[in-house]
Amino acid sequence: MRRAYAVLLALVCALAAALVTAGPAQAAAQTITNGTQFTDTSGNALHAHGGGVIKVGSYYYWFGEDRNADNTFKYVDAYRSTDLKNWEFRNHVLTQSSASELGTAYIERPKVIYNASTGKFVMWMHKENGVDYSEAKAAVAVSSTVDGSYTYQGSFQPLGDNMSRDITTFVDTDGTAYMVSAANENYDLHIYKLTADYTAIDSLVANPWVGGHREAPALFKRNGVYFMLTSAATGWSANQQQYATATSITGPWTAFTNVGDSTAYNSQTAYVLPVTGTSGTSYLYMGDRWGNSFGGTVNDSRYVWLPLTFPTTTSMSMASWYPEVSIDTAAGTITGTSATYNTLIARNSAKCADVPNQSLWQGIAISQYTCNSGTNQKWWFKDLGTGYYELMGRGSSLCLQENSTNVTQENCTGATTQQWSLTTSGSYVLVKARTSGECLDVNGASTANSAAIITYTCSGATNQQWTRGS
């Protein structure tokens, strides 16, 4: 009996020790809704705009901009996750009180790299005076812990007089670190080698695209080939992303080649994250859909994440928009959810269900408008497998929601007010709200543009009959 008790006690102690020493739970595959403003594990808006990611142990740490309402610098925030979906807020790692020159400033595109020789985490960023963009400086901060408070080292123009705006950083396999920045009023992209401690510029090693007018660089290496992904310089507005390649970081580099659609699916490059697991390494495009481009601020921005693919060793593709992206950090796989988008055409008016003014804001009431193939008239009928569908807008990534007096677009939550059934009525369909049982209806059977779309007692009238167009 005593021997059995001793064995049981040993097993309990071993289990307790294992629990104490265990790391974070193994991440499971996660599905992320694209083109939305993410939230952290406390339900707060996640502000890591223009940011970058570093992996430390089992955690991915995401750093980015958290700004004031006037877009001036407030914080650089740090979050961590094992699965790239569930992000825990860790710290405001850099604040206005970190240095006097940060009291009124713009701090943009913070990137953190780790120096194995010094044991320090080094943050590089773009710094301006908070009034205009005349300073064009790089800035540096350091910390002994990845998510601790960073000590600000100051700001400067590289090598004394080179302008420095949008930046990124990269640590090569030999431990050499580089900083890339938009220079010469954004007409050049400079590639700088950093000093051994990563806190200063050692030398300018390449200026491959003189006069190219590119910004928002992201640099990564795949199978011995360097890829530089950039955007054109059009302020907050999205534009055509392009990439170039080289087998040496100092060049020669190729000319730029288009990737993605003409607006990078309404986003701008922030970072490219390698995700390595048991099945290999995949590459995640991380972009910002800037709030300033649709009447908001930086903190209203949405995140656009897409898988990058590589048809050859020196080519890259971002060929499709996916409303959802599934990431398995354990396997190292990233896949997009393919979706067919349809218009929803009212029989009585031959007009389309439309998000007015291509708005990306929640709470916007849906109306009808002349069909024009805009993304604000395209809807993904996401089959929930329960006899109901969510209707997600292609342009906004928001879901059609029934309210007491109108139908609006809102953050997709899975609520029953966002679930709809389809009933065939001849060659048309009735779209019925799950909560009320009422049908999607053009108010007053109007044929005019901007007439409200509501829900109303199902009658089978032509203003409740719809076709799903291409």
Predicted regions and their residues:
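Lectin-like carbohydrate-binding module/patch detector with strong preference for beta-trefoil
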Residues: 336-470
